[in-house]
């Protein structure tokens, strides 16, 4: 299956327009969005851009209902009331409402999750570190990938709002072992990179964000 990965959005509604063209051309059979839909540098007061970007995401979700969505730290910081770089106080009310609207646009059984899985590929915002898994879920069946994904998706803010969680981890800068390094491929965003590349079992694709 050919999958289109839509990396971190950060208030760029045109990314969904470009993704829609790719889908219309039949280049990919399915899409996965790594989210971080809100926030960009010096855009905290541009509420219209927040609305426009979320509306573009919602329209894409309705047009391509099989698209999978993975929460980013910038999405969750509004839900969990955590202040993140670029956090917009003026947008603090509209972002959770728009996320709820996006959730309502998705078909039943296709909820926004921390981790999504297609075949032997895991999609999440930051990446699943082996150390995180063993600390957060010490009794999970390590080799049962479906169970691991299910258990991670059930974790609370307490487990997820830290530097090694799947929404925060940066394997590009860390030497930590990743989950199932020889059996599973992970596709991640979160950390801006100049070009898409693979290192070990991790493909990094956040090429539209800025430092």
Q: Model segments located where?
A:
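Beta-strand-turn-beta hairpins that frame and shape the catalytic cleft
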Residues: 1-4, 116-123, 198-201
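Short, basic, glycine/proline-bearing loop/turn elements
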Residues: 1-5, 38-43, 155-163
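Core catalytic region of metal-dependent phosphoesterases/phosphodiesterases
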Residues: 6, 11-97
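Active-site neighborhood of phospho(di)ester-bond hydrolases with catalytic His/Asp-centered motifs
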Residues: 6-7, 31-36, 68-73, 123-124, ...
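Flexible, charged surface loops at secondary-structure boundaries
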Residues: 24-27, 62-63, 117, 177-182, ...
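Short catalytic/ligand-binding loop motif for oxyanion handling, primarily in non-cytosolic enzymes
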Residues: 40-42, 76-81, 124-126, 130-134, ...
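Active-site-proximal loop/helix segment associated with metal-binding centers of metalloenzymes
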Residues: 90-108, 112-180
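Conserved beta-sheet core of the metallophosphoesterase superfamily
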Residues: 167-211
């Amino acid at each position: 299956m050919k999958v289109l990965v839509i990396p971190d959005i950060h208030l760029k509604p045109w990314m969904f327009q470009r993704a829609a063209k790719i889908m219309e051309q039949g280049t990919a059979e399915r899409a996965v969005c790594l989210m971080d839909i809100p926030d960009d540098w010096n855009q905290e007061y541009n509420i219209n851009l927040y609305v426009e970007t979320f509306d573009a995401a919602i329209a894409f979700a309705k047009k391509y209902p099989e698209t999978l969505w993975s929460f980013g730290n910038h999405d969750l910081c509004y839900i969990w009331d955590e202040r993140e770089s670029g956090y917009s106080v003026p947008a603090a009310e509209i972002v959770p409402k728009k996320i709820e609207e996006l959730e309502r646009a998705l078909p039943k059984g296709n909820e926004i999750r921390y981790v999504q899985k297609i075949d032997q590929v895991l999609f999440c915002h930051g990446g699943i570190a082996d150390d995180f898994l063993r600390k957060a879920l010490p009794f999970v069946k390590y080799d049962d990938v479906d169970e691991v994904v299910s258990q991670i998706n059930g974790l609370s803010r307490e487990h997820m709002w830290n530097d090694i969680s799947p929404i925060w981890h940066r394997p590009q800068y860390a030497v930590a072992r990743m989950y199932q390094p020889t059996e599973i491929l992970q596709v991640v965003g979160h950390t801006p990179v100049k070009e898409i590349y693979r290192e070990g079992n991790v493909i990094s694709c956040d090429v539209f964000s800025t430092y």
